[in-house]
Structures are given as structure tokens and as C-alpha cells.
Amino acid sequence: MPAEILSELPLRPAPRDIKIPNAMHNEERRHKHSRSSYSEMSPLMSRNNSLTWRPAKRPMPTPDKTIAVINAAGRQAASFIRVATAVGFHVRAQMRNLEGVVATEVSTNPNVTVLQGELYTKETPAESDKGQCVDVTKNGPISGIGVNDALISELFRGAQLAFINTTFYGDEERIGMALADAAKKAGVQHYVYSSMPDHHAYNKDWPSLPLWASKHRVEDYVKEIGIPATFVYTGIYNNNFTSLPYPLFCTDLQPDGSWIWQAPFHPNAKLPWLDAEHDVGPAILQIFKDGVKKWGGGKRIALAYEMLTPLEACEVFSRGVGRPVRYVRGPIEVKVKIPEGYRIQLEALEELFNLHNEDPEKQPPYFGDIELERSCPRAALELWEGPRGLEEYAREVFPLEEQANGLTWMIEEYDGGGGNNIGNNHNNHHQQEEHYQHQNGHQNGHNGINGHIVNGGVDSESEEEDSDSDDEGLVMRGNKRADEEWLA
């Protein structure tokens, strides 16, 4: 039934369309880009209005080069592979095995071709030698241990670039030279080698650190054969710190929830620091992007983003983790089974950073070359300006790595170290130094072990074992990095 019109209500005519000059159509007003601040003739209109025609997008340039990388599950290599493949490089990566989170990450990366195997070979043992293990971590030539030339040759097939960080598994010097020879034969255009110093070459009074001296000799060989090369020297890894009983960088968890770091370094001598997992990759990538024109000719680059004394390192680490961290200058304690080659390295390191030296100015430069050390962190920041410092690492990453390694302190209640204030009690350099002096004197007077590796109950004369053994003691067994090369 039609609605009844009440005569007492006034009738209103339907509204007319009001025409406004230059008004937009309704459908245009509804579009999110229709109210552009640019005129229709503006060349920027196509950037601000999706209704206008725009040319097809140009494809992003993708690197067409392949990079050869060894020890791909190690900290330096894995960091580099992440960033290099993210921007389109292809990587040919050698790995000892495919076990662990990092190896899985690398091997499942679509831009990575994995070559699984050792860089060394072992001869079939004679009948009289069967059942005996060979320690493949010793410095220098090892009887029965050779170089896997077939794998090395295959690694460089089709590669134009190379990032090489050798380790002490096998004869590092022979392997390093074989890698350089293969790279030259393959026509590699830029060879970046992760080197370290031979301190004895800089000062005859300084001992060589065997595992570093091997790298130094490989560096000399790379220069000798004329590959376009750059050499990077990495500082102390932030992520070396662990509550697990590994030597040199063990942060020993105390009953009150604090930590003690004991090492032979002078408490007031500056040391270079680097977050290997976060910062090596971007820095190496920039070296390749800049090319040999800028970084070739055998240039050395110190990769370190902070110069901190042990006392300063403990201070910033304490701020990050929220608990007291104290430094004790003392001998390196070895409480787990370690490869013999690494044991020899630690003994030499104690001799180099002499516990009896009371003058921080007399401590040898970590990188051997004082000028290289003075370039920190300027040279590294020229490559990568977004580093993760030790404090940030301690706050954001250290608890996660500790939990992945089976530790639980981060989820347990912490009473603040018996009510002591962290800032007042442990961020004061003078109080830390008093603690260092007391501890050092105690060990000298009672233990009689100053300047020597503390055996920790491990028989150094025990039968040498192959590095493949699951009982090395230096392979983290947690989920986070079960396969990472120690200090690689």
C-alpha cells in the first residue's frame, strides 16, 4: 500500500546536482591515489597515482658471479653465505658434514651448491697401525695426511670469486696453498683470505702462535703466486664467550649468578672485538662489491668494530646481560678434551701475552702489526656501518645461545648477586683490578701454574684422536650450532 502523504508536512523538491568547476568524478574521489599533489602534467604523477600509465618495472640487477667458500658451517663463512646469497650471488660451499642447524641452513639455500667432504685425505693405515687414531690438528706436516685435491679443484669450477678461511683440520699450510693454486688455475678474479699474524715475524722476541703462523705463511704464498687478493684479520669473536667449560673464553658461572672470565691478557691492554655471525658477512660482501681496484694488491683489513680492554669488555658485557662479569688475569684453564693442535696454540698464546708483564703498553698487538691494529675500527666501518657491539650481543644473543647449549641460568630466578648493585660493584675498573691482582697472586703462590695450561684433569699424554671423533670436547652439542668449527 503506498505511503500516505501527510498534508501538514511541507513538500521539498529533490536536490539538484550542483556543478562545481574542476570537480573530480565520484569514482575518482574514492581511489586512494586520486588526490595527488602533482598536476596531471607532472612527471612525478606516475609515481603517485596508480591510475596513470607507468612503464614496466626494470628487473633488479642480479649478480652473475659464483663464489667459492670453504668450511661453510663455520661462523665467518655462514655469515657471508647468508648475505651473499640474499643479494643473488651463487655459492659453491665445502662442508665437512651436513649435521646441525647451520649446515641445514646452508645446504637448503637455493643459491648454494654444497660439496661435502674433508679438505684433507687419510691414507689407508698399515696393518700395524690399524686401530690407532691420528690427530689431524697438529701444526705442520702430518704422516699419512694429504690434501683432497679433487674436491678442491671441483670447488672452484665456475667460480669467479673466493672467500677462504682455513682451519687447523689437516695440514693447514698445505691445504691453504693447494686452495690458492686451484683458485689461480680456475681464473678466480678476487681471492679474499681470512688470515692471522705470525707475531715472530714482527718481533723476534715474540713467539709464533702455530695456528696463526700457518695462516700467515699461506698469505705470503698467495701474494707470491700473484692472485688478486685481499686479506682480512678478524678480531676476537663476541660469540666466543660461553658458560660451557671451553678454554680461554669461558665465562665461569658463579653460585651467586655472576660470571668470571679468566685469561692471560693484560686487564688494561686494548683488544679488537668482532661479532662474527652478524658482521663478517656484510663486510666481506662489500669487499667483493668494491673489487680489487680498491682492495686488491694484497691489502690487509682489520675486521674489528670495538677496541676494548678485558676490563672494559666485562663492563659492557655486564651492562648487556644484566649481571656482574669480572675479569681475572690468570692462566688458561683447560677442563675439557681439546685437539692437540689447539692445546699447543693456547700454550703459545700464554707465552705471547706474558702473565708477568705488568705494562699494558708492552703487550704485543693482537694483529701483530701495530698499524693494522690502529686502523680499528675505522677500516671495518668503511665496509659495514651496522655492527653489533659486545653489549648488544650480550643482551640479545648470548642468552639464546646459552639456552641452545643446554644452560638454564636465563630462566632461573636471579637475586642480584646477594643484593650487590651491578653498576657500583662491577662496573668500576679499580675494583675489578683489585680482584685481578688478588686472584693472580693467589694462583702464583698456591697453585704453581702461572703461565702454563691448566690440565683440568685431562691427560695430555693420552692417545691422540682423530678430529672426526665425536668426543672432541670442542664441538657445541646444543641445537644452535652443533656443527660449527670451533673458532672458525
UniProtKB/Swiss-Prot annotation:
Residues 36-45 have a biased composition (Polar residues). NADP(+) binds at residues 71-76, 165, 215, 237-240. Changing residue 386 to C/S: Few, very slowly growing transformants. Keywords: NAD, NADP, Nucleus, Repressor, Transcription, Transcription regulation. Coiled coil: none annotated. Its main location: nucleus. Residues 14-29 have a biased composition (Basic and acidic residues). Changing residue 2 to K: Loss of function. Changing residue 386 to D/R: Loss of function. Residues 438-459 have a biased composition (Low complexity). Residues 412-488 are annotated as: Dispensable for NMR function. GO terms for cellular component: nucleus. The keyword Transport does not apply. Residues 460-473 have a biased composition (Acidic residues). Residues 1-45, 422-488 are annotated as: Disordered. The keyword Repressor applies. SUPFAM superfamilies: NAD(P)-binding Rossmann-fold domains. It is found in: Nucleus. Pfam families: NmrA. InterPro entries: NAD(P)-bd_dom_sf, NmrA-like, NmrA-like_oxidored. May be a redox sensor protein. Negative transcriptional regulator involved in the post-transcriptional modulation of the GATA-type transcription factor nit-2, forming part of a system controlling nitrogen metabolite repression. Interacts with nit-2. Belongs to the NmrA-type oxidoreductase family. This is Nitrogen metabolite repression protein nmr.
